[in-house]
Design a protein with these regions (language model features):
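Nucleotide/phosphate-binding catalytic cleft detector across ATP-hydrolyzing
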Residues: 6-155
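A short acidic Gly-Thr/Ser loop motif
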Residues: 1-3
């Protein structure tokens, strides 16, 4: 799912200048340009948990997702656009070492792409088996999944 929002400092300054309240969430926008009519989200099947024992197949799967991202993000904005891949319930049910293998391979694939990553972020997950790529690839909690579902429905 993709969202676009204004620079926070600019939004604050604009609200102050116009006498608008600061305690209101900013409006999320679809952005501009020729890609504005493209859908903001894409879901492909099966989920990440289906790659148990076959992490070598993750590249093609992730590339399907990234092809969609490239259709809505202008090419000149890719290096400033962070990518986050958030896995849900199916991945939470897997053994920690299996989750970690899938997350790490997903991290390796997206690190090869032209998107923004903090240069200090390492590919490894360390002791945390639910996160890789400094949080760019992770298994979200049930609470986070519910919150993001609410956002998707309401925005």
């Amino acid at each position: 799912m993709g969202y676009s929002w204004r620079d926070a400092a600019w939004e604050r300054d604009m609200r102050v200048a116009q006498g608008k309240p600061l305690n209101v969430l900013p409006h999320l926008e679809r952005g501009s340009g020729p890609s504005v009519s493209a859908p903001w989200q894409v879901k492909i099947e099966p989920g990440f948990s289906s790659f148990v024992g076959r992490t070598q197949d993750i590249r093609g799967y992730v590339n399907q997702l990234l092809t969609h991202v490239r259709s809505v993000v202008p090419p000149n904005a890719l290096p400033q656009t962070p990518i986050y891949i958030m896995a849900t319930a199916g991945m939470r049910m897997l053994k920690p070492e299996v989750r970690q293998a899938i997350l790490l391979e997903t991290c390796r694939v997206i690190r090869e792409q032209p998107f923004y990553f903090d240069p200090d972020v390492q590919d490894y997950a360390g002791a945390d088996t639910d996160t890789a790529c400094g949080g760019h690839v992770r298994v979200i909690t049930g609470e986070e999944e519910g919150m993001l579902g609410w956002l998707a429905v309401n925005y």
